[in-house]
Amino acid sequence: MIFFFNQIRSIFTALHTPTQQIQLSRRAFFQFLGYLGSCVVISLAAQSKYVQ
């Protein structure tokens, strides 16, 4: 399984410049943070509905 991820990483590295890799990595990171934040907001909204 680790070999598979290493292959994917090498393909990604071959197709993108280091600057592009940084930009894509940052974009993916902030999208992930947005996803987690929306999960928290939805969870809090659902809890407040049932508390009252």
UniProtKB/Swiss-Prot annotation:
Mitochondrial intermembrane side: 1-27
Record's protein name: ERMES regulator 1
Organism, as annotated: Saccharomyces cerevisiae (strain ATCC 204508 / S288c) (Baker's yeast)
Reported function: Mediates the formation of endoplasmic reticulum (ER)-mitochondria encounter structure (ERMES) foci, thereby contributing to the formation of ER-mitochondrial contact sites.
Assigned protein family: Belongs to the EMR1 family.
Main location: mitochondrion
Cellular location(s): Mitochondrion outer membrane
Record's bilayer topology term: Single-pass type III membrane protein
